[in-house]
Structure formats: C-alpha cells, structure tokens
Design a protein with these regions (language model features):
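Acidic, mature catalytic/reactive cores of soluble proteins
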Residues: 1-298
C-alpha cells in the first residue's frame, strides 16, 4: 500500500544508438566484469533540469535529446527522445527496459518469468503496461548482469544484482532527418500520452510557484523540489512526506522536521493540515507514530 509497499518494476533503461554498424551505449552501467562497462557519459554533451531531467548526447553527427517525467499522481513514467541525424547513415535508437517486478531491495526470484502479451508485461503477480510510437520488438527472455553497485555496497546494500529483458523499443532515423520517440510505462491499463505527462508536470510546478509567491529563481527551484517529497498515504487517504525518499519511509520524526520547509514555507497550508491529520489518525497516548502499521504489523 502506498507509499511504503514499493515494487521495483524497471531497474534501468539500456539506451543505445547504432550508426555505421556500430552500437554505442548512451546509458551507463558498471558490471562485475569491468570489460563490459557501459559508459554513455563519454557521449553526453549536456544535462539540464528544471521540471524534469534532460540529457543531450552527440555521437558521430547524430544528436539525441532524452527527457523523462513522472506523471503527477500516477504510477507512470513518460520518455521522449528527440533524434537529429546529421550523419550519412541511418541511425537506430534502441531502448531496452531492465525488468525486475520485485519488492524494493529484493533480488529476482529463481526462475522468474516475464510474459509479454502485446504491450502488457506480467511477472510475479504484477503487470506493467506500455505504449510507444516506436517499434516494440519482442526479445527472448534473458538475464542482464551481474551489475556492480559500488555506492550501494558502501551502505551495506547488495553490491551486485541482475535484471531481465524481454523486449526493446526501436526507432530508425534516415540520414539528414529528425524524429521523435515517445514511450510511457504505467501500472494502469489506461495510459496517458507522453506529452500529457510532461504538460501536467509543468502545469503542476507553475501552480506551486504561483502559490509560494517567490520571485527569486533559487527559491522557486526549492519549491518545485520540495513538492516531489509529498505523497498520498493509502491507509488514511491523506498526505504524507517522504523526507528520506527513496531510501526511507514516512517516518514521523523526519516528516515533522520537513513539514515547515516543504509545505508551510511554500504556502501549502492545506497539504500541511492533511499531513498532520494523517499522523493524528494513529495518535496513541498523546504520541504520533514514527512508523505506520502496514499489513497488520504493529
């Protein structure tokens, strides 16, 4: 149940660009076998972030601009890739999701199977839907890994892991032309368009900025960033703050520390009231919870 019953559906996106018969990684990933390391940073020309992250890659006369956005209030991620092929040969962009479908922090199950039916992926009792204007190409199910997570290992989390693949999305761009690849992955059957996800996120952020009333650019950026930590608690139907996201849950202490800066300073008094009501719903002996009971746990 939201927000603490988290499931990792897609671990990462393996982005590649094929030019002149050579496949070049745009994404980056360490492997236990260092010779297999994918280092797309070598081709990254720029990175910007306002309402959403945007990466720019330049490879042998081709430019790829990637944008990603989370749909507000939905379990949906939208992707837009703009490819400008100034080269003399066809460019093929390939996006391969690395799938897991397991609770956060857990490994793939032994023999875990992923079923692809049209644009629906099922595994481990869970389903993910997608839509794209590119070509969805089924692949024989295969494992990717073992990946190396050096920074996670420093925190005592697993230092290595695996993921599965069973499809990719492709878009071919002839020389001298520009094309756009769009894709949306979501847990709901009714999928928004990629452009809708971006426009809703932008509209939400403009509304937050107007409510806060700040004119300073840094202050407006903090208002946008603070809004990303507000979540809805399914057990109470009210708001809560994931102050330590993505690592921690909505701990009472951290939520109360974050509430003045994330909500009151941003002019979000009704949301602040909802957060307090969420915690007061579990008040006991004059104390509010530091952790919420989930699934029958105390």
């Amino acid at each position: 149940r939201a927000p603490n019953r988290r499931v990792q559906m897609i671990q990462r996106l393996e982005d590649t660009l094929t030019l002149n018969g050579r496949t070049i990684p745009l994404s980056s990933q360490d492997f236990e076998d260092r010779a297999r390391r994918a280092d797309g940073r070598a081709y990254q020309a720029a990175f910007t972030f306002r309402d959403y992250p945007q990466w720019t890659y330049q490879v042998q006369g081709a430019e790829v601009v990637k944008r990603a956005a989370l749909m507000p209030g939905e379990n949906a991620v939208a992707l837009i890739y703009e490819i400008n092929n100034r080269g003399r040969s066809e460019a093929v962009l390939r996006v391969t999701p690395h799938l897991r479908f397991v609770p956060k922090g857990e490994a793939l199950l032994p023999g875990q199977q992923f079923t692809l039916e049209g644009k629906r992926i099922s595994s481990n009792g869970r389903t993910l839907y997608f839509q794209t204007n590119g070509q969805a190409v089924p692949l024989p199910q295969a494992l990717r890994g073992p990946f190396q997570f050096a920074q996670d290992a420093m925190d005592g989390k697993p230092a290595a892991g695996w993921a599965a693949v069973n499809h990719c999305i492709e878009l071919s761009v002839p020389p001298g032309e520009s094309r756009t690849l769009e894709a949306v992955y979501a847990t709901a059957h009714t999928l928004p368009g990629a452009a809708e996800a971006f426009s809703r996120l932008e509209a939400q952020n403009r509304a937050l900025e107007r409510r806060a009333g700040f004119t300073d650019g840094a202050a407006r950026a903090l208002v946008r960033a603070a809004g990303q930590f507000l979540s809805r608690r399914e057990s109470t139907g009210g708001h809560t703050i994931l102050a330590g996201f993505p690592f921690f849950e909505d701990w009472g202490r951290d939520t109360m520390i974050a509430l003045p800066g994330c909500l009151l300073a941003a002019g979000r008094c009704q949301e602040a009231k909802s957060v307090l009501e969420t915690f007061l719903a579990y008040e006991q002996d004059g104390l509010v919870p530091n952790l919420f009971p989930e699934g029958g746990e105390e």
